[in-house]
């Protein structure tokens, strides 16, 4: 039986190879016709050289790329087509880490809208109540409420991979009842 369900997988790349891996996967889609998409969260950084400024696009999380594919296609990318990378493991199931679609959609939405306003932290902030943003540009995003230095943040977790937080006024939040 061939599995047709597509999942988001978190993969690690070799040092400073994120863009090369993304380009290689995109080329495989065109040349080989495999149905795989990838997402590399990026941000623009302005660095000061001696007498000029240089604008460059860098990955938000070093060595991390997200791949949307079936389990078989995800394995084929590295085993058959030779793309360099390693899938992150889910320690509870001892299989490839699958990122839930809702978490991935929320993360991609926040990163596409305002990548400079997102703080990343592998150590979780103070965990609080589950909330949804009901107003503003982040409307519809679900996460957990956290406060740090009297500022309110909504923490978006991609379990086992990373934690992102966005600054949101408390009046824009609504508690989710479990």
Predicted regions: what they are:
Residues 2-127, 145-146, 155-178:
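Acidic-enriched and Gly/Ser
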Residues 152:
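Glycine-centered loop/turn positions within well-structured domains
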Residues 140-148:
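Short beta-strand-centered aromatic/proline hotspots
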